[in-house]
Amino acid sequence: YVELPVDLSEVLFIASANSMQDIPGPLLDRMEIIEVSSYTENEKEHIAKEHLIEKQMKANGIKAKQLTISDKAIEDIILSYTRESGVRGLERCLGDICRKTARMILQDGKKNVKVTEKNLEHFLGTKKYDYEMANAKNEIGIVRGLAWTSVGGDTLSIEVNVMPGKGKFELTGHLGDVMKESAMAAISYIRSVSDKFNIDKEFFEKNDIHIHIPEGAVPKDGPSAGVTMATAMLSAITGIPVRADVAMTGEITLRGRVLPIGGLREKSIAAKVAGIHTVIVPEK
């Protein structure tokens, strides 16, 4: 902008982004992509205990013996007050705790403050996120899927209801075009193998099928929920319950093949946090 010539031939430009989906195609095509995985909950906990807590205590003038934060409190902060791939939000929460502790020491004469999972809301307020745990019992038409987002792995319940009707197929839950097409592929596959599961040939003409993925305000997209939707539909149609401690992920084809998926590490960690004991993934 100062209209001076600059030789950029030897310059290495390094750019970062939270999601590649927001980068324009022509720009992305000229870049060498290096993907960095999000931190796990365990890694975040270690970063907090070894670096962030000490940093925030020093910034707020708190001595080592004046503040103690339990391991369970740190875990609750990570799961219930932040939803991120890094630790910026976690550091902000720890900063809020340190500032409130400093005020308690100065105004209330407290000599030391202990933060636990029981009094955490006193420091940070009501929980912002509710981590969905595994269902307590096996249910018909409800299957747990796994998602990979820009902030890490997540689990999502897929619900299917079957009711008398005229063959209507409905999808709700703020689904994107790719996920809708995946659902259509799943229902087509089930119809093609209906004889194998003793499903009446006229069933799909005499009944409506409704697929819903809760948290309708949150946009959802991607093909990897195909096998989950197919399983949920088959469960609802046959009346066979699905194990509550099982989650699955994979794109399904019209021939029933399950294609490879991404983000397996993040998805597996999300399943473990949610209390899922078995994860079904594509063989390849």
Pin down the residues of each PLM region.
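Substrate-engagement module of ASCE P-loop NTPases
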Residues: 1-9, 38, 235, 273
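Short glycine-/polar-rich loops that comprise or flank the Walker A/P-loop
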Residues: 8-11, 28-32, 243, 275-277
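Structural signal for conserved beta-strand scaffold positions within catalytic alpha/beta enzyme cores
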Residues: 15, 33-35, 213, 248
